[in-house]
Amino acid sequence: MTAQSSSTQARHGMTTDNEVLLEVKGLCVDYVTESGNIRACDNVNFLLRRGEILGVAGESACGKSTLLNALGRLQRMPAATSAGQILFHDRNGSVTDLATLSEADLKPYRWTKIAVVMQSAMACLNPILKLSEQFIDVQRAHDPSLAEKDALTK
């Protein structure tokens, strides 16, 4: 599995923002089985800065989805995060370890400050609708009071 990030700002000639957004340290995810644990992600470390896009690529069953599910705290049994930190650096300067939050404490972060976009046939963009319509629809699903103009700039 490979994870690479690139700055969209740098590619478009804008000044890059060196602010750290997400820092993953020593993340391990195991699948718990009757015959013992199977390590799917072993000591994953990376840093993602604001304005960067992270792509995760690899062979089938190498742990890509397991890693992304762990980052969003979306994994289900038998998968379990066994070690590591998922540090979210908020714009206000606070740093929160998402791996240690309860579901209730995680709620203000999930889908508003951090989200995972999975590749899936059912999650593809609709070729019949304009892109802007699809983005507005997603934004309004999370914030029904959001004006169309604000949804497009977000």
Regions found by a protein language model. Give the residues of each.
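ABC transporter nucleotide-binding domains
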Residues: 2-154
